[in-house]
Design a protein with these regions (language model features):
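Outer-membrane beta-barrel "beta-signal"
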Residues: 120, 215, 271-274, 302-313
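Transmembrane beta-strands of outer-membrane beta-barrel pores
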Residues: 6, 17-21, 33-35, 42-48, ...
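Repeated loop/turn-to-beta-strand initiation elements of outer-membrane beta-barrel proteins
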Residues: 8-13, 25, 34-40, 77-85, ...
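Residue-level detector of the transmembrane beta-barrel scaffold of outer-membrane proteins
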Residues: 12-14, 28, 37-41, 87-93, ...
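Solvent-exposed loop/turn segments connecting transmembrane beta-strands
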Residues: 1, 5-9, 14-27, 32, ...
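C-terminal outer-membrane beta-barrel translocator/porin domains of Gram-negative envelope proteins
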Residues: 40-47, 53-55, 59, 106-243, ...
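Outer-membrane beta-barrel initiation region
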Residues: 1-30, 35, 39, 105, ...
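Gram-negative (and chloroplast) outer-membrane scaffold detector with strong preference
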Residues: 60-76, 87, 214-218
Length: 313
């Protein structure tokens, strides 16, 4: 991926390529010179999707390269004073992708899906020191609504989210508690969740009503300050203990009676992250990488996975 920024820092742009079994191209830019902030992204490559083709439908469709466009605009109001960082961010987002969507009402396919999303976020937390992993004290609240105004097959998704930060038992330790609630109105299709299921579960599980509570305790382990030539600089090792709880509800049709019933699920997971903050080849952007181990009591499974993130700001 290529990144660029103008001298004032008001305009940033990116362009990249990836291989996902097919050629995929990505590009975007963000302009912060005037309010509201404007953000544009486009992804191109692969065949566009055909959503829910009936078995008895033999209609020939001309598939094109998949194109997804996201346009976002927001105003980052800031009321920061002294030690407290305070802000309020209203946002609107428009997305389009050129999939085929089947409608049982018209018994035909509709080309292209348009999605509108609106959100507001408010936050207030203490400024962090260099060694802090999370704010020592603070709160974040957010509410969002998403719908498909030109695709009658979908309903809407609405969610509310809150997160609180509290100090840990030692310096630079942090306790983070969060809770979220989501409701989806279903018409012809059930859409994917906007929230993440507990760690260790897949986000493509069906859901109509979902509530989630999470607890994370983050702590620094050591500061090796070690480098191997110009290739790797290891700055810090950290750990994170977590526990996730969720209640999920959705409707389903019984195979025998064909009656519609509600299914209630209780989901739980817990685990640990071991992470390292590193710089590779003297690149300025820090890389956070490590291992996550999740235990799911429902299935008694232990699931290891790799974590990787890059901070570009």
């Amino acid at each position: 991926m290529l990144l660029s920024q103008d001298l004032t820092g008001n305009l940033t742009s990116s362009a990249g390529y990836s291989w996902r079994g097919y050629n995929a191209f990505h590009a975007g830019f963000t302009y912060k010179g005037l309010y509201p902030v404007f953000d544009f992204k486009i992804n191109y490559g692969g065949k566009n999707s055909i959503i829910e083709r009936p078995n008895d439908n033999t209609q020939t469709l001309s598939q094109h390269n998949r194109t997804q466009i996201d346009v976002r605009s927001y105003i980052p109001f800031s009321f920061t004073r002294s030690r407290w960082i305070t802000g309020f961010v209203p946002q609107i987002k428009l997305s389009y992708h050129n999939s085929y969507l089947y409608s049982s009402i018209t018994a035909d396919f509709q080309y292209g899906m348009w999605e509108m999303g609106y959100s507001v976020q408010a936050y207030r937390y203490l400024k962090m020191s260099v060694r802090d992993l999370q704010p020592r004290l603070g709160i974040v609240v957010q509410s969002a609504y998403k719908h498909w105004p030109w695709n009658a097959q979908f309903g809407y998704i609405y969610y509310m989210y809150g997160r609180a930060y509290l100090p840990g038992v030692a310096p630079h330790h942090s306790l983070r508690m969060s809770g979220a609630w989501q409701k989806q109105e279903i018409k012809e299709y059930r859409f994917g969740t906007w929230l993440s299921f507990p760690r260790g579960y897949y986000n493509h599980l069906p859901t109509e009503k979902l509530s989630i509570e999470t607890i994370d305790y983050s702590l620094p382990i050591c500061y090796p300050d070690w480098n191997w030539s110009f290739l790797v600089y290891l700055k810090r090792l950290t750990g994170n203990l977590f526990c996730d709880l969720a209640q999920n509800q959705y409707r389903y049709v019984e195979n025998v009676t064909k009656q519609v019933r509600w299914r209630h699920e209780k989901l739980c997971s817990m685990g640990i992250d071991l992470l390292a903050d590193v710089h590779l080849m003297q690149i300025t952007f820090p890389i956070n990488m490590g291992i996550r181990t999740v235990y799911v009591p429902e299935t008694r499974e232990i699931q290891p996975s790799l974590l990787l993130s890059v901070a570009f700001n």
